[in-house]
């Protein structure tokens, strides 16, 4: 393994380290380029990963719970929503490791197994999410455009089988990540060769271009079908239109930049015919953009719950019910706390303290007049 000279972001000195990438295990060349700076993207990566982790964990927990309730009621679409939420939840749970790694100047100190597992979860999550977005769009397309024909044919068992196939297929494709042998760095790039170029072409075509075409086509047909419907109000049609547009926009924003960088690198390798100096120059110029765009794909973990669960009627009703229950519980808690506080204040008042101490009261014979001076509250 050739050492790589990395610019130290704090003192500007070059530090020799050994660099690997999760796809190094594919039998690809481990030769690297020099003078790749990690400091340029450090702040952006730390901020984005921290924000996605903070927002994504509770959002996907709520999404998974709401989707599970719908699955138990026989909702087919909810199967894909549940799998997507669980996948995103697993990934967002690993983001703190990314933050530690980046803050440590891309030096992995948590052990080789942790690097392998984190890399495996990350790259699997990208394409599992993309495929589940396709499944969700296709299921909505069938349910809306072919509402009568699909009645009784959309089954929960079929959705579970498709979900299992997605997990197995993506898991097998990325399994070679576990054969990585390097120990000091993780997730970083290698110099291009013909096999990596082919891998990038495949990822762009199968992992992005085809799914994007499916999502764009299905949502366009959904919108057109709803537009021609006479049974929906203008507000309902606008809601469906905005939802369809949002799906495509989020997909493009999260996944298009990174896959376009992959395509540029693969095309440049083909154009320069593998010239090492030309490719190293390209790697050094595109490295910061590449890792930032890769980081941008994690925003999908926050966007998916908003689009596919919180925007649906059933989910909004469930969220409203949970919020109402939480509000009632909070009000009861506030009343209890206020009552307890008021009782405490009364116990601390002079009159209350006097009442709580035992004093012998004067005994008046029957029929005798009351004393002239007494507390108003005291009776004869």
From Swiss-Prot:
TM segment ranges: 46-68, 80-102, 117-138, 159-178, 198-220, 247-269, 289-311
Cellular localization per UniProt: Cell membrane
Keywords: Cell membrane, Disulfide bond, G-protein coupled receptor, Glycoprotein, Membrane, Receptor, Stress response, Transducer, Transmembrane, Transmembrane helix
Cytoplasmic face residues: 69-79, 139-158, 221-246, 312-380
Glycan-bearing residues: 35
PROSITE patterns, sorted: G_PROTEIN_RECEP_F1_1 (PS00237), G_PROTEIN_RECEP_F1_2 (PS50262)
GO molecular function, one term: G protein-coupled receptor activity
Disulfide cysteine pairs (residue numbers): 115-186
Pfam families registered for this protein in UniProt: 7tm_1
InterPro entries per UniProt: G2A_lysphc_rcpt, GPCR_Rhodpsn, GPCR_Rhodpsn_7TM
Superkingdom, taxonomy of origin: Eukaryota
Ranges facing Extracellular side: 1-45, 103-116, 179-197, 270-288
Membrane topology, as annotated: Multi-pass membrane protein
GO cellular component labels: plasma membrane
Induction details: By stress and DNA-damaging agents.
Tissues in which the protein is found: Highly expressed in macrophages and hematopoietic tissues rich in lymphocytes, like spleen and thymus. Weakly expressed in heart and lung. In atherosclerotic plaques, expression is observed around the lipid core and at the shoulder region.
GO biological process: one example: negative regulation of G2/M transition of mitotic cell cycle
Functional summary from the UniProt entry: May be a receptor for oxidized free fatty acids derived from linoleic and arachidonic acids such as 9-hydroxyoctadecadienoic acid (9-HODE). Activates a G alpha protein, most likely G alpha(q). May be involved in apoptosis. Functions at the G2/M checkpoint to delay mitosis. May function as a sensor that monitors the oxidative states and mediates appropriate cellular responses such as secretion of paracrine signals and attenuation of proliferation. May mediate ths accumulation of intracellular inositol phosphates at acidic pH through proton-sensing activity.
Family to which the UniProt record says this protein belongs: Belongs to the G-protein coupled receptor 1 family.
Protein name, UniProt field: Probable G-protein coupled receptor 132
